[in-house]
Swiss-Prot record:
This is Transcriptional repressor NrdR. It comes from Synechococcus sp. (strain CC9311). The keyword ATP-binding applies. InterPro entries: ATP-cone_dom, NrdR-like_N, RNR_NrdR-like. Belongs to the NrdR family.
Amino acid sequence: MQCPSCQNTDSRVLESRAAEGGRSVRRRRECLNCEFRFTTYERVEMVPITVIKRNGHREIFNRSKLLHGLSRACEKTGLTPSKLEEIVDNLELSLQQSSSREITSSEIGELVLSHLKGLSEVAYVRFASVYRHFRSVSDFVSTLEGMNADKAELAALV
């Protein structure tokens, strides 16, 4: 591992531990040349997932893009950045565990909405409005009515 301070390639590992719920290894290293200490992370290389956009265009799944959209929808809702990271982590893990290497953007949107539904109604509606391309107030109303119907069904079961 190359030292970020002097670019020497010889270092020793001082400490190793599991990180990110066991999905990576965090290593504390010391450069043998300048004694600078730095941290590295070792992760399993994920097989790329291809996202099929609405227009048929294909692109590699971009975790940052999804996290950014989720962050925008969840502004001022009380959901913490770590919770949003957890949502994206869970979604990415389920995509990696899937037998398919392709997924539509619609399927990703529905997966995100299923996570948001139980966490924040406001974030759910905001994300749905962008993802489902709401064009009028009636689109918002029908989504809210659907959420209320789901609540009524749950209340009837209890």
